[in-house]
């Protein structure tokens, strides 16, 4: 595998039709066939598209975009989004994200930086339980990674959709988007609820939901089960190992 990577073989891209456009997957990524792409996070994609269905001219912020699968799946399924702003700090994934964003049928930008509640720098580290590049998390401070906030983009007063998959930095992303969220005509946010990440950070995802409620009223639903979530108890149940996605929609 290392020899193939050194020779650039794994940078070869397999192009798949997705809706009216083409989506590219590099060979070095986990093996993915067309059916895997079409059914990627199907419960999350279905609920997210349902929640944004009444939006017009929406802006989608994709935080932790990897190669752009989520944004592309949404744009293939929904006409609610007119602009995508995607972020991926991993230098291996970013060139493929940039190419996939350029192929979307809507205005789209890709930024090779992390998203948090400050503008500055940091570095990516891997947790002991997962060495995959998609599990790396941001450590603020001196480092090669640029960091920005959603509020920096000043998309105030618009219909806003946000996907956050940043391995434990969800609260920081939300704090850095508070003005955007508070001023939005409507807002839909997807947050990953990962038991191992919560164990590392000591923060149950309910804290993110409580923060959103402090800004404005939201409805919270688990994409995989359809369960409505209350903020009077932890999101993650004792002994839970399955990763869930919480879709938060303004009431």
Task: Annotate the PLM regions.
Residues 1-100, 104-109, 153-155, 208, ...:
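S-adenosyl-L-methionine
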Residues 65-69, 91, 115-117, 166-168, ...:
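Short, glycine/acidic-enriched loop or turn micro-motifs at the edges of active sites
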Residues 15, 116, 123-126:
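A conserved beta-strand/loop capping segment in the N-terminal third of enzymes
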Residues 27-29, 128-132:
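Active-site/binding-pocket entry motifs
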């Amino acid at each position: 595998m290392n020899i193939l990577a050194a020779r650039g073989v794994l940078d070869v891209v397999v192009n798949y039709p997705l809706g009216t456009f083409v989506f590219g997957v590099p060979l070095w990524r986990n093996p993915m066939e067309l059916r895997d792409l079409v059914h990627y996070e199907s419960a999350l994609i279905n609920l997210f598209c349902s929640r944004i269905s009444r939006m017009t001219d929406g802006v989608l912020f994709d935080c932790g975009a990897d190669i752009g699968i989520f944004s592309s799946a949404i744009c293939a399924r929904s006409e609610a989004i007119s602009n995508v702003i995607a972020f991926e700090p991993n230098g291996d994934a970013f060139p493929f994200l940039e190419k996939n964003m350029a192929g979307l049928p809507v205005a789209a930008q890709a930024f090779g930086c992390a998203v948090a509640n400050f503008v500055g720098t940091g570095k990516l580290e891997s947790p002991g339980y997962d060495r995959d590049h998609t599990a790396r998390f941001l450590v603020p401070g001196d480092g090669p990674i640029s960091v920005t906030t959603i509020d920096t983009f000043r998309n105030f007063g618009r219909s806003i959709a946000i996907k956050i998959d940043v391995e434990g930095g969800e609260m920081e992303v939300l704090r850095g988007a508070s003005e955007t969220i508070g001023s939005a005509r409507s807002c839909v946010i997807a947050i990953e609820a990962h038991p191992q990440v919560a164990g590392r950070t000591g923060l149950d995802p309910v804290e993110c939901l409580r923060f959103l409620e402090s800004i404005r009223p939201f409805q919270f639903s688990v994409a995989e089960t359809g369960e409505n979530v209350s903020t009077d108890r932890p999101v993650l149940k004792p002994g839970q190992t399955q990763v869930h996605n919480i879709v938060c929609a303004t009431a």
